[in-house]
């Protein structure tokens, strides 16, 4: 196969069969490509370092299955589009038609090129003595493969991008273009990634408001495990990362393969196993009827789909975290400790009260102050005013300047709450422009939280919202927007005919975020959606953090934090210290447990600090100071979650990239069935290092805490990484809802 190198691009001859090997961070992707078919992923999994052309040819040969009994005459070679012509009888990657024709296209590759991120290995000539006469192997490190294919009979062109990132994350997307004069209706366009036979257990997530990302497991059996999001947002019940792995896999053990559909609107994510044993992960946008109808020359591009392989869930999560942290727009300055006033005042906006909150916040080390819902229009409760983004003269007769001046005078940034995609029927904008409300026609959808959806797909509505927001950003020094989204998009059509508009609405929301940030480069955005119902890699192309959940109860947050981090790193995960009695669950928790839970994310406070006594304020200051002291480690380190030796005890931590420093939390989740529980083995350390282990938990020891004899006192205990990882140390006794934090520092020598 001829290859032409035009740094940094390598053009490959599409008329000849070729094999491409991408290898980075312990992951290999081997693709077999020929003009007769779309790319076939022969291997996606553990690295194959030093792979040679002859070995690749052999690998391709042994990967072809035999013909099934009474089946088609050629073995099935599953391509990334799950094409039916290749013999795949499961869910196809493309569903569409042109007046009931062109519904099963046969694409032929017309162009292949490769853009390596890492140095190119020399192209290896074919050795005829080994019988490999039809191809060579092109091997690179991280890089992106671009494939263009056409079907002249169907008048369709397909472009596929597959990128292996430096972190070993495999991401892909496809673009379909109509080249005929008649429209082509796209019902679905997605990609699939292959799963090996040993991947037989599924882990994905369920949830609801106040309890997001609840793990659930099941066997991958013949059929389709399909997770659809039809709410116009990611959903509190989203699959999050749909993982299939070796039965019994955990945080450290077992090979796992996972897929995330990076889109904030309607979407599909699935795992499928056929009668012949072939199995895949797939993802796509879920398109409603007529949302994508392509005229000549028009194109539709899928969301990015993200595939993450790892040995254990922690390694899989690290691939997402490392990639997110490598983005040029990833937040790099220390994440400001944030006060959000919502649970302190709700809609009771009084300057005196809010200024007093600012005073108390500054005194405990807060760096950003966020004014939540209730500052605009007639928004005195949640039944009116939404959509009128003008400061209320009734509540703020002098505008927001008196509060903002007070906040910034205390050295804090100022943030403001918006819900740009929503509207109350009782609002000036709804009365003036009822045609901007999304609906299936003449009737309105059922209200949710007394609100409807404002159609940002209508240019005039988009401009109205944008201009009101820009006016506020230009009048006031707003450094941060809490961007909320508090209802599902059900029956969300564009008036007057009611055609579905979720696709256009989602892209318009992205465009509005991008436009605001382009005009205000230092602006940060938080993605909030009834709490944690918009946590995905699509919105994180524009947002700087997500709100994990409206439920700030630390008992619930322990699990939500644990599993939210399967996709996103701690610095993007909003984690707040709330009042002693949870506003969501009614549970009562000590400040020790509330703060000890929150410091592991992007720390914030959502508590009426004017009601905190002196002892609570002093303890809170200690926790905020602790977070700031360790913020760099917490927000750059490798996340470690330990499989429980006993369900009564949980443990997680972060380890610095060079393994010279770590923090671990030991959490009492319940009363154990046995006492003592036994030894805890830490992970992620360097076996040859010696570590000084210290208990650095702020405040006094919690009720019932019983130390084992080895427990580090003030000077700390020195133990090797090998001992800590292989043998372990005896756990302390912790009462439920208490915790200890250990700091590990590699000693010199």
Residue ranges of each PLM-predicted region?
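Polysaccharide-binding surfaces and accessory modules of carbohydrate-active proteins
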Residues: 18-21, 29, 40-272, 690-710
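Conserved, mostly hydrophobic/aromatic
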Residues: 26, 174, 297, 339, ...
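Carbohydrate-binding surface patches
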Residues: 26, 242, 644-687
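Short Pro-Gly-centered flexible turn/kink motifs
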Residues: 109, 292-310, 736-744
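Active-site neighborhood of glycoside hydrolase catalytic domains
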Residues: 397-399, 431-433, 437-592, 600-607, ...
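C-terminal beta-sandwich/jelly-roll accessory domains of carbohydrate-active enzymes
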Residues: 455, 670-749
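Catalytic cores of secreted or luminal carbohydrate-active enzymes
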Residues: 592-640
